[in-house]
């Protein structure tokens, strides 16, 4: 699931994914965060 968070590296997505979905797994794809939910 993509969220509207800009990123350059995957670890920048972990906290936003945790906040949005309660899971700290995700990666940066195409400058946007994708959370694995």
Swiss-Prot record:
Protein localization: Secreted
List the Pfam families hit by this protein, alphabetically.
Toxin_2
Q: Source species, please? A: Centruroides noxius (Mexican scorpion)
Its domain of life reads Eukaryota
Tissue specificity of this protein? Expressed by the venom gland.
Kindly state which keywords UniProt assigns to this record, in alphabetical order: Calcium-activated potassium channel impairing toxin, Disulfide bond, Ion channel impairing toxin, Neurotoxin, Potassium channel impairing toxin, Secreted, Toxin
User: Belongs to which family?
Assistant: Belongs to the short scorpion toxin superfamily. Potassium channel inhibitor family. Alpha-KTx 01 subfamily.
Q: What is this protein called?
A: Potassium channel toxin alpha-KTx 1.11
Q: Which cysteines are joined by disulfide bonds?
A: 7-28, 13-33, 17-35
Q: Where is this site: Basic residue of the functional dyad?
A: 27
Q: Name one GO cellular component term.
A: extracellular region
How does the record comment on the protein's domains?
Answer: Has the structural arrangement of an alpha-helix connected to antiparallel beta-sheets by disulfide bonds (CS-alpha/beta).
Instruction: Note the InterPro entries from the entry.
Output: Scorpion_toxin-like_sf (IPR036574), Scorpion_toxinS_K_inh (IPR001947)
């Amino acid at each position: 699931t993509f969220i509207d968070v800009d990123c350059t590296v995957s670890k920048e997505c972990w906290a936003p994914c945790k906040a949005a979905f309660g899971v700290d797994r995700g990666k940066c794809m195409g400058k946007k965060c994708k959370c694995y939910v």
